[in-house]
UniProtKB/Swiss-Prot annotation:
Modified how: Phosphorylated by host SRPK1, SRPK2, and maybe protein kinase C or GAPDH. Phosphorylation is critical for pregenomic RNA packaging. Protein kinase C phosphorylation is stimulated by HBx protein and may play a role in transport of the viral genome to the nucleus at the late step during the viral replication cycle.
Region (RNA binding): 177-183
Region spans: Disordered: 143-183
Sequence repeat intervals: 155-161, 162-169, 170-177
Region (3 X 8 AA repeats of S-P-R-R-R-[PR]-S-Q): 155-177
Localization per record: Virion; Host cytoplasm
Keywords: Capsid protein, Cytoplasmic inwards viral transport, DNA-binding, Host cytoplasm, Host-virus interaction, Microtubular inwards viral transport, Phosphoprotein, Repeat, RNA-binding, T=4 icosahedral capsid protein, Viral penetration into host nucleus, Virion, Virus entry into host cell
Source species: Hepatitis B virus genotype B1 (isolate Japan/Ry30/2002) (HBV-B)
Protein name, per record: Capsid protein
Annotated InterPro entries: Hepatitis_core, Viral_capsid_core_dom_sf_HBV
Assembly behavior: Homodimerizes, then multimerizes. Interacts with cytosol exposed regions of viral L glycoprotein present in the reticulum-to-Golgi compartment. Interacts with human FLNB. Phosphorylated form interacts with host importin alpha; this interaction depends on the exposure of the NLS, which itself depends upon genome maturation and/or phosphorylation of the capsid protein. Interacts with host NUP153.
Main localization (coarse): virion
Length: 183
């Protein structure tokens, strides 16, 4: 069975394969990032989004994989065989987990459409012969200048005060935003 874990998100294994393996941070760094940004939502018993669910599943798979690796390390006597297993896990399984975690964390951080646009842009860039492409690869955190990011459900703020109000001479204080689960 050929299952593509990105299909329901509008991406594909092939699309992510354009990114070189050293592009993806270590699993430890990705887990730290997921925990720092989305711990509350990931630990919540409530469903937040398919991306949160996918991150949970990837974390569970990684934990199981590490349990297996520990067992192999303790029970396989032949050092050469042990090294082969560890190398396979790090090269193949580790990369798949890193790709999954990176994709879903990025979708939560930058929004899915931006990540998909980035993957397509990078794919076009990497397949263009070096003589014909810009020297620098596209960067995910660089959004086009025309992009406007607004929270859902909120109307845009007025840019000018109403004519009846007088402007205060003192600077305005910003309201502190309360930290809520980012679902």
């Amino acid at each position: 069975m050929d299952i593509d874990p990105y299909k329901e998100f509008g991406a594909s294994v092939e699309l992510l394969s354009f990114l070189p393996s050293d592009f993806f941070p270590s699993v430890r760094d990705l887990l730290d990032t997921a925990s720092a940004l989305y711990r509350e939502a990931l630990e919540s018993p409530e469903h937040c989004s398919p991306h949160h669910t996918a991150i949970r599943q990837a974390i569970l798979c990684w934990v199981e994989l590490m349990t297996l690796a520990s067992w192999v390390g303790q029970n396989l006597q032949d050092q050469a065989s042990r090294d082969l297993v560890v190398n396979y896990v790090n090269t193949n399984m580790g990369l798949k987990i890193r790709q999954l975690l990176w994709f879903h964390i990025s979708c939560l951080t930058f929004e899915r459409e931006v990540v998909l646009e980035y993957l397509v842009s990078f794919g076009v860039w990497i397949r263009t012969p070096p003589a014909y492409r810009p020297p620098n690869a596209p960067i995910l955190s660089t959004l086009p200048e025309t992009t406007v990011i607004r929270r859902r459900g909120r109307s845009p703020r007025r840019r000018t005060p109403s004519p009846r109000r007088r402007r205060s001479q003192s600077p305005r204080r910003r309201r502190s935003q309360s930290r809520e689960p980012q679902c």
